[in-house]
């Protein structure tokens, strides 16, 4: 399932991924403390996530359950970025991504292991 999340929707999902299933009121309290959102803003964003199929609403008390994983969103967002900026070329993406950063020996070793697993 590929769902495009806006930044505000991503914030709600991050709370659910980090904390697990919660009542909407609990999400509102967390986001009030973390980023200053009021209750109405949080409920509006939760409802948008429900409409997109990212969250399931369960009763009683507006219980929210994430229907998509962080990994699914990361994959979809990464694919969109690669398609948009690199013409779909993962090689160009990795080349650009790795050219500016100094990688540690451990990071280089982990990348080599990942590539070897693909063979």
What are these regions (language model features)?
Residues 44, 48:
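Alpha-helical DNA-recognition elements
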């Amino acid at each position: 399932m590929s769902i495009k999340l806006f930044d505000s929707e991503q914030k709600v999902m991050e709370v659910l991924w980090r904390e697990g299933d919660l009542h909407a009121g609990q999400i509102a309290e967390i986001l009030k403390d973390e980023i200053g959102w009021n209750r109405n803003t949080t409920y509006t964003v939760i409802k948008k996530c429900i409409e997109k199929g990212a969250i399931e609403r369960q009763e009683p008390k507006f219980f929210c359950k994430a229907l998509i994983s962080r990994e699914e969103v990361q994959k979809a967002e990464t694919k969109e970025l690669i398609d948009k900026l690199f013409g779909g070329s993962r090689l160009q993406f990795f080349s650009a991504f790795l050219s500016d950063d100094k990688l540690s020996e451990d990071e280089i070793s982990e990348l080599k292991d990942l590539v070897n697993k693909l063979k």
